[in-house]
Each structure stands twice: as C-alpha cells, then as structure tokens.
Amino acid sequence: MAKRSLASLNAGDLSGKRVLVRVDFNVPLNEAGAITDDTRIRAALPTINDLIGKGAKVILSAHFGRPKGQVNDAMRLTPVAARLSELLGKPVAKTDSCIGPDAEAKVNAMADGDVVLLENVRFFAEEEKNDAGFAEKLAGLAEVYVNDAFGAAHRAHASTEGVTKFLKPAVAGFLMEKELQYLQGAVDEPKRPLAAIVGGSKVSSKIGVLEALIDKCDKVLIGGGMIFTFYKARGLSVGKSLVEEDKLELAKELEAKAKAKGVELLLPTDVVLADNFAPDANSQVADVTAIPDGWMGLDIGPDAVKVFQDALGDCQTVIWNGPMGVFEFEKFATGTNAIATTLAELSGKGCCTIIGGGDSVAAVEKAGLADKMSHISTGGGASLELLEGKVLPGVAALNDAA
C-alpha cells in the first residue's frame, strides 16, 4: 500500500504547526570530530526546506552512532547542527537532550519556519526498545510527524514507529518517498530485463536478498568474496580465499533454484589473486578452475568484467548491492570500478540503475560516478530488507495514501 507523503500537506495544513521530522544524520566523522561526508544531511534538505517554506516549526530527530542508551559526548549532534545551519543558511538550535525541559523550552520559543535539532535520540535506551512512554514524550513536542529516515526505517524504534501512535498525520518525507518509489518499483514493477549485481564478502549476509532476487530477476551476477563459497560448493580449489564452510549447501541450493527458474546466474570466470591481504600484495590473474594454493581472490578478473558487461548490455533495470572485490585497496578495485563505469553508461542509455546502499555507494562515490546513477539509496540494511520483500516497520507505521 502506498503511503501518504509530505506532498499531500499544504501550507494550510502546516503553517504554525510543530512538525517532528525523523531524519538520518548518522554521518561519518574524522578523529577531530569533523564531518567527512555530509550526503545524508543534504539528502534531507528537500523535506526540511519544504516545511520551512510552508511555515512549519521544524523539529528534527536523529540518532548518531551506537551510544547504547548512555550519554556520550563524542556522539552529540553538535557538528551536524553546525553543518545543517550552513546548508540551510539559517540558525539551527540544538537541544541538550531530545526530551525534557531544554527541548520543551527551545521548541516553545520557535517561530514559524524555525529549525531545532533534538540531541541524539539513542542517548535513551528507551528509543531502541520502542518504549511507549518515551515515544509519547518525544511526540509531545509536536503535532505532525514526517519520517524521512529511510536508513532507519527497518527499525521499530520509538522515533520511527512509536511516535506514530501519538501524532496524526504521520507521512513520508520526500527522501523516504523516493527510496520507496525506486526500490519497491524495481522489485514490484521493473522494466525488464531486470538484473541484480550482488557483491560483498559473505553469502550469509546476503542470503535473503539472493533468494528474493532469484525469484524476481532475469539475471543475477555475483561478485565479491562470497563467490569462493560457490566455487568450493562446485568442488573447485579456492586456495586461501574466504569461504563460509557452513554455507556450501546453501550455495548449491541457490544455483539449483536459479537454474530451475530459468534465471541466468553468473559467477566470475576469472579472478585477481593476492599472496596476502594487503594493498601492496603480489597479484596475478587466474581462471577460477586454476587457483593455486596459498593465494586468495580479492577481485573479479578482466574476463569476468567483460562477461558481466555483456550480460548487463540489454538490461532496462539494474540493482547493485555490494562491491566486486576489496575496492579499498587500489590494486583490487578494478572490477568494482568497471561495474560502476558500466552502470553509468547504461544510465545514459535509459537503463534504471539503482545503487542499493552500503559499500556500493562508497564505491560509486569513490569512482566519481554517483551523479550518473538513477538512484543511490541512503539505507544499507533498510534497502536490503526492502529488496527481500520485508515490511519496514518505520514505513508500515505511516498513514496510507488516500
């Protein structure tokens, strides 16, 4: 069921109203406490600016890091408030706590169009427990609820799910709406052929996604460290490459399932090997049937790249989740960069390219190709769960569209 969106609320609905907006401001900081990537803050600007323009009092709620229900000064949202203020070109007041006297005083002092950022909601253990009393206090600051934190939508927490019991309407922000349109659309009503590229080191973390995608896709391309579990399941020697011994049967089952459904399941034909796990390791390219002892695979090989590019050539929708190799090491980033370049070219030809969160986003940004993709998801775990066909609690809690 489609969810009600912020677009359905006009200035008459919002002017002078206190609006609680759950955002995803979980940004990386360096050792000096400075933000190194403000993508998530910028992603929330359309929703925040729309509310400011409609005369709302904008109360932002966010988490940062994993403080485990304790106040941790290193995880305060102070640098986020400063950066948001720069991006909005107006002051952003930050509260000392997300509930209590200081939060109430700062909210009560707001004029229409003002913005207040509540302190890290995870300083309270009740947030992750979805405690009703805590949710009611948080909701008590506002009259309307907007969830724009897709990256936290797979969590049933007080600020994502609990508050919706006390605030009406409860609607999706523009970022949330865009994520749902692209990710659900890709799975439910894709332009075909639909291909998924799944990478990463472990089969175990992508089991649900692989099973769901084999059900829905025309082609599934697998890269990253997880390929060696598939090779070993086929009886091949993999040297000292990463293998999940307890997932060998599952790998066989996934291959059999794809075959039975007529889905093209592609594994790399060659790999780039290293003699140890290091950026300056000695390397060689080998066919997957001839991996020598003592070597480990850290990237897909040049032939595999060509085969993957050919397979993607006629696709109208491509979902990518997980790198092809250890792209943090320049020597073993070639496969990942080649896939990023291929998807950028396909986008230019009208293919819908969706980068499904996590490391693939970092890889695309590192390659300087982020603006060439149709959609880059801001949620790692949330995008995986949505692709698996799971219901996201933070989405389910919102009002249905009329």
From Swiss-Prot:
EC number(s) for this protein? 2.7.2.3
Q: Name the predominant localization.
A: cytoplasm
Signal peptide segment: none
Metabolic or biological pathway, per its Swiss-Prot or TrEMBL entry: Carbohydrate degradation; glycolysis; pyruvate from D-glyceraldehyde 3-phosphate: step 2/5
Q: What residues bind substrate, as annotated?
A: D24, F25, N26, R40, H63, F64, G65, R66, R122, R155
Q: Which domain of life is it from?
A: Bacteria
The protein's enzyme class: transferase
Q: What InterPro entries does the entry give? A: Phosphoglycerate_kinase (IPR001576), Phosphoglycerate_kinase_CS (IPR015911), Phosphoglycerate_kinase_N (IPR015824), Phosphoglycerate_kinase_sf (IPR036043)
GO BP terms, alphabetized:
gluconeogenesis; glycolytic process
A single GO molecular-function term is: ADP binding
Localization terms from the record: Cytoplasm
Q: Where does ATP bind?
A: K206, G297, E328, G357, G358, D359, S360
Q: Does the keyword ATP-binding apply?
A: yes
Reaction equations catalysed: (2R)-3-phosphoglycerate + ATP = (2R)-3-phospho-glyceroyl phosphate + ADP
- CDD domains named in the record: Phosphoglycerate_kinase (cd00318)
Q: Is Nucleotide-binding among the key words of this record? A: yes
Query: Matching Pfam families, A to Z?
Result: PGK
Q: Which UniProt keywords apply?
A: ATP-binding, Cytoplasm, Glycolysis, Kinase, Nucleotide-binding, Transferase
The UniProt entry's GO CC annotations, sorted and at most eight, read: cytosol
Q: Which PROSITE patterns match?
A: PGLYCERATE_KINASE (PS00111)
Subunit info here reads: Monomer.
Q: Which HAMAP family does the annotation name?
A: Phosphoglyc_kinase
The entry's protein name is Phosphoglycerate kinase
Q: Organism source for this protein?
A: Parasynechococcus marenigrum (strain WH8102)
Q: Which gene encodes it?
A: pgk
